[in-house]
Amino acid sequence: MTIALGKFTKEENDLFDIMDDWLRRDRFVFVGWSGLLLFPCAYFALGGWFTGTTFVTSWYTHGLASSYLEGCNFLTAAVSTPANSLAHSLLLLWGPEAQGDLTRWCQLGGLWTFVALHGAFGLIGFMLRQFELARSVQLRPYNAIAFSGPIAVFVSVFLIYPLGQSGWFFAPSFGVAAIFRFILFFQGFHNWTLNPFHMMGVAGVLGAALLCAIHGATVENTLFEDGDGANTFRAFNPTQAEETYSMVTANRFWSQIFGVAFSNKRWLHFFMLFVPVTGLWMSALGVVGLALNLRAYDFVSQEIRAAEDPEFETFYTKNILLNEGIRAWMAAQDQPHENLIFPEEVLPRGNAL
């Protein structure tokens, strides 16, 4: 019996090894295996968005002008969602709707599904890029884990929410004013601001901004350079080998301010990671709930009392009336294909009126 010792060696010209060597080579812009997903998808998503906002109308899907060619500016231009009648069709260029006609495909809203799907895979490719680079230089993968927060929000808002509704029509269009319209829609039809998952998301994002500002200011406050005292600008010298700020001084400062302070850098920075990412995850979970039409908090007793007593009104009941107003006024404007008509007497008014 023959026993072979050592590693099994492949042929030198193995195609996988050649590709791996080229993709992961040290260059100015790292490509990597993740780049095979990231770069094409990012290119097509951005290219589709610039094309749509420059040339493509939303007249056939929303009855709106949405391109620079029609007179919109950066804040009002958008790549709009497909018509409600198209439901959840992928709207492939070669599909039964467009039948290979590029003009018809753009008119039907095909660019929206094109941008949304390529954008989602582009974001996933960027997260995989962070995993791949972290593995290459032997780092932990927390950057990629952190980036899962924005991905979760994007996928939940642009893909899962409209999948739970009647079609892509109810997703946000890709534009600044279009996103604002979608926020108003979320408030009017889902009372989103009173949703506990939205509250957790706001706490996470604003809390992270506060932590970031405090952390940056504290590090700047305690910069030092050995032998030169507290000289902020000399401490920026990148050739200094030692640590450039004093954790001990920072701890003493915040202990006096709040009575408590972080004494461990790892816990401090994990907390700065945990707060925003958890907030984004919670927001994404909330939007998934809205896709299923789960309700936010309802304080029915206040609504009943406000209906019975003209002198009783709370900020909650006023907001509920505002939501009714948004629904009544917005539905007719936002869904012209439904031919909704609300007579004046059914439009909501506050108790003062």
UniProtKB/Swiss-Prot annotation:
Taken from the UniProt entry, a GO cellular component term is: chloroplast thylakoid membrane
The residues listed in the UniProt record as binding pheophytin a, with positions renumbered to this chain, are: 130, 143
What does the entry list as the binding residues for chlorophyll a PD2?
198
Q: Where does chlorophyll a ChlzD2 bind?
A: 118
Write out the annotated subcellular location.
Plastid, Chloroplast thylakoid membrane
Might you give the EC number(s) for this enzyme?
1.10.3.9
Q: Where are the transmembrane segments?
A: 41-61, 125-141, 153-166, 208-228, 279-295
User: What membrane topology was assigned to this protein in its record?
Assistant: Multi-pass membrane protein
A GO MF annotation of the entry reads: electron transporter, transferring electrons within the cyclic electron transport pathway of photosynthesis activity
The UniProt keywords, alphabetically, are: Acetylation, Chlorophyll, Chloroplast, Chromophore, Electron transport, Iron, Magnesium, Membrane, Metal-binding, Oxidoreductase, Phosphoprotein, Photosynthesis, Photosystem II, Plastid, Thylakoid, Transmembrane, Transmembrane helix, Transport
Segment forming the signal sequence: none
Amino-acid positions noted as binding Fe cation in the UniProt annotation, renumbered to this chain: 215, 269
Give the reaction(s) catalysed: 2 a plastoquinone + 4 hnu + 2 H2O = 2 a plastoquinol + O2
What does the entry's cofactor note say about binding and number?
The D1/D2 heterodimer binds P680, chlorophylls that are the primary electron donor of PSII, and subsequent electron acceptors. It shares a non-heme iron and each subunit binds pheophytin, quinone, additional chlorophylls, carotenoids and lipids. There is also a Cl(-1) ion associated with D1 and D2, which is required for oxygen evolution. The PSII complex binds additional chlorophylls, carotenoids and specific lipids.
Q: Which residues carry this modification: N-acetylthreonine?
A: 2
Comment field (misc): 2 of the reaction center chlorophylls (ChlD1 and ChlD2) are entirely coordinated by water.
PANTHER family assigned to the protein according to its UniProt record, in alphabetical order:
PHOTOSYSTEM II D2 PROTEIN, PHOTOSYSTEM II PROTEIN D1
Question: Subunit structure, per the record?
Answer: PSII is composed of 1 copy each of membrane proteins PsbA, PsbB, PsbC, PsbD, PsbE, PsbF, PsbH, PsbI, PsbJ, PsbK, PsbL, PsbM, PsbT, PsbX, PsbY, PsbZ, Psb30/Ycf12, at least 3 peripheral proteins of the oxygen-evolving complex and a large number of cofactors. It forms dimeric complexes.
Report the NCBIfam families cross-referenced here.
psbD
Q: What does this protein do?
A: Photosystem II (PSII) is a light-driven water:plastoquinone oxidoreductase that uses light energy to abstract electrons from H(2)O, generating O(2) and a proton gradient subsequently used for ATP formation. It consists of a core antenna complex that captures photons, and an electron transfer chain that converts photonic excitation into a charge separation. The D1/D2 (PsbA/PsbD) reaction center heterodimer binds P680, the primary electron donor of PSII as well as several subsequent electron acceptors. D2 is needed for assembly of a stable PSII complex.
The protein in question is named Photosystem II D2 protein
